[in-house]
């Protein structure tokens, strides 16, 4: 997998994300509370319980021992004021989970799981759309950096991310129009196959 390309290539298809080829990394947006309880996150939890356990542990560790990152000031679309914010991790980061043996044996394919932490909460506590988009920018940049590090440090015998596949993340329960998240992927210069459900 080449990272990042000069020009992005986002290919949208209808189908089942979980039918992605062996070695693909499946990208989805996550909350920071350790819950994959509804929507496509629930499907991820059901298909990849070992990956879910890693995600949940990652969130619980950061909830019990909070760490923060200070985000530089950005100009908001609504005003000309520049505001900065402190962000509690893992918000605005990515977690790349290698294929887990138990999940791969059950599903017949080795899939990497990439969690983009785009909303602090879920349900009524979901972050506002502008915050989710900003967190998506940060998380995609973090994912791209981590993938480049993985690629640079890999021996020929090690499993590697072969392709990036994604759902239309943030567009479901987080309520952000897909076009806004797609723009983030395009701006990152990534090659991603985006799968939407049949008729979706």
UniProtKB/Swiss-Prot annotation:
GO terms of biological process kind: peptidyl-glutamate ADP-deribosylation
Domain of life: Eukaryota
Keywords attached to this entry: Hydrolase, Protein phosphatase
Residues in coiled coil: none
Keyword Hydrolase: yes
Segments forming domain Macro: 1-200
Stored SUPFAM superfamilies: Macro domain-like
Database matches in PROSITE patterns: MACRO
Catalytic activity field: ADP-alpha-D-ribose 1''-phosphate + H2O = ADP-D-ribose + phosphate
List of residues binding substrate: 15-17, 29-31, 36-41, 169-175
Any GO molecular function: phosphoprotein phosphatase activity
EC number: 3.1.3.84
Key word tRNA-binding present: no
Top-rank EC class of the record's enzyme: hydrolase
Family label: Belongs to the POA1 family.
Role, per record: Highly specific phosphatase involved in the metabolism of ADP-ribose 1''-phosphate (Appr1p) which is produced as a consequence of tRNA splicing.
PANTHER family: ADP-RIBOSE GLYCOHYDROLASE OARD1, PROTEIN C6ORF130
Protein name: ADP-ribose 1''-phosphate phosphatase
Organism: Neosartorya fischeri (strain ATCC 1020 / DSM 3700 / CBS 544.65 / FGSC A1164 / JCM 1740 / NRRL 181 / WB 181)
